Amino acid sequence: MALKARALYSFQGENKEEINILENEELHLFSDVSLDGWLQGTNSRGQTGLFPASYVEILRPRSGSVQVDYSGHTQGYTDSPHQGSYDDDEEDDDDWDDWDDGQTVVDEPSGSNGVSRSQLQHHHHYPRPEYTHRPRPALERQDSIASGKRGSVVGRNLNRFSSFVRSGVEAFVLGDVPQFGGVSESHAIEMGPKGPQWKANPRPFSCSVEEPTKQTKFKGIKSYISYRLTPDPCNSPVYRRYKHFDWLYNRLLHKFTVISVPHLPEKQATGRFEEDFIQKRKRRLVLWMDHMTSHPVLSQYDGFQHFLSCQDEKQWKAGKRRAERDELVGASFLLTLQLPTEHQDLQDVEERVDVFKAFSKKMDENVLQLSSVVSELARKHLGGFRKEFQRLGAALQGLSHSFQLDPPYSSEPLVGAISHTGRTYEAVGEMFAEQPKNDQFRFLDTLSLYQGLLSNFPDIIHLQKGAFAKVKESQRMSDEGRMEQDEADGIRKRCRVVGFALQAEINHFHQRRLQDFKQAIQHYLKEQILFYRRVSQELEKTLHMYDDL
């Protein structure tokens, strides 16, 4: 039975985690337990997010207490890293082919801010309501009071749903993340010519994604597409479904809080077995795999290596559980980082982060604009250009037919040449319609990948900004005699870890950006040259038909 509430007052959300509610509006709650004075639920417009608990009245059944089942709402606030979740071929089944022998041990992440972007970013157009001003609720402070631990003297962030808090990075900076004895996993950051960078993978490799094949099970009741993955240099192929990629992607999000994990290509509810969609997803999985194998940290992740190599059912299940029970995830992953000895002034790091923040915002805007322009051009190739050239060809052939109506004055060679010209332009129209798959679609694949990568950085940068704020607060408290200098130095040291990790990720992003956009635009230009050369050759052949008239 769904848990419902009624809004006592109107509330206007002030950030992407909060939603608007109207007085007397009926709301659906995920739980009646408030977190620091906030509830999470869905309004009547389908928007999911947070609103003040004091602004609503929970509607409880009159007849006794009823056990409320929240399982139906789990998807409402579990992160969906790519839009659409109705892909029938992605449903969980029981057998080894699905690699799913039970529920996932570790809860899936909800993105860095705890609420699914796809749930928060609805594009409904409703008239803006009039809101009655009411002070925002006072948040409960029990978790902000200094505990007996020395590392928790600095006040905690009151917004318990910010990415800085939910990721655990706040707890790490304050020294509240427990140390693990005998940590075997480690990732080194070294100083390069342009600042901190991830140490290269000592065993670099690549992996091809090939042969998307439709397969069936349960005597044809279930259908799905599998892909052949062949890591190089081992050259031992494995076959994976999209849902297996999805499982891996969620493990990556759960573990690597400070790394921009490339987004998977989107799911699709209908038409997923159509050839165009299959090829599009394959192209984008190729790019995704290329970014994964080229990343010095992601490529060495045990879960990724297991995904690429395991072929045995029992071994897979053991490795799957191992990945899901990994304790070095989120903020604990920061414990695995080995930093260089070089000193970096935190103010310089903050300025560097601000520069990248402005850069990534501008690049994101321009990638979106370029993607829109290229998409429109591709649509014209498929529709408008093709249609116009076919109209031109038909008109020329109509002219040639009219020349035959007065036989004594008709010129067969000229009629034939004009008719051939018409057919040539019709063929050119078909060439325009076929061209996007050679250049524009591939360019759009790269732009889509970078839209995903860039969309990760605001939350990652927010982690660093939160760490900077804790350093400044701790230093102020130390100067006022309210904190030992050793404690403030510890916070500064842990902030340095976050700063080095972010700079290393920025460095890797720029390296890949330079390489990817060089290759993408080179490929686009080469294909455009070949295309117009073929068009030119067809027109030249037609032109020569007029030479001897």
From Swiss-Prot:
Domain BAR: 346-549
UniProt feature, compositional bias: Polar residues: 66-83, 110-119
Subcellular location: Cytoplasm, Cytosol; Membrane; Cytoplasmic vesicle membrane
Keywords: Cell cycle, Cell division, Cytoplasm, Cytoplasmic vesicle, Endocytosis, Membrane, Mitosis, Protein transport, SH3 domain, Transport
Keyword rRNA processing: no
GO CC terms in record: cytoplasmic vesicle; cytoplasmic vesicle membrane; cytosol
Presence of the UniProt keyword Lipid metabolism in the record: no
Residue intervals of the SH3 domain: 1-61
Pfam family, one: BAR_3_WASP_bdg
InterPro entries from the UniProt entry: AH/BAR_dom_sf, PX_dom, PX_dom_sf, SH3-like_dom_sf, SH3_domain, Snx9_fam, Sorting_nexin_WASP-bd-dom
Region spans: Disordered: 66-137
Record's compositionally biased regions (Basic and acidic residues): 127-137
MF term (GO), any: phosphatidylinositol binding
Membrane topology annotation: Peripheral membrane protein
Domain PX, chain residue ranges per copy: 205-315
Gene Ontology BP annotations: cleavage furrow formation; endocytosis; endosomal transport; endosome organization; macropinocytosis; mitotic cytokinesis; plasma membrane tubulation; protein transport
Source superkingdom: Eukaryota
Compositional bias (Acidic residues): 86-101
Main location: cytoplasm
Similarity-based family: Belongs to the sorting nexin family.
Entry function: Plays a role in the reorganization of the cytoskeleton, endocytosis and cellular vesicle trafficking, both during interphase and at the end of mitotic cell divisions. Required for efficient progress through mitosis and cytokinesis. Required for normal formation of the cleavage furrow at the end of mitosis. Modulates endocytosis of cell-surface proteins. Promotes membrane tubulation (in vitro). May promote the formation of macropinosomes.
Free-text comment about domains: The PX and BAR domains mediate association with membranes and are required for membrane tubulation.
Protein name (database record): Sorting nexin-33
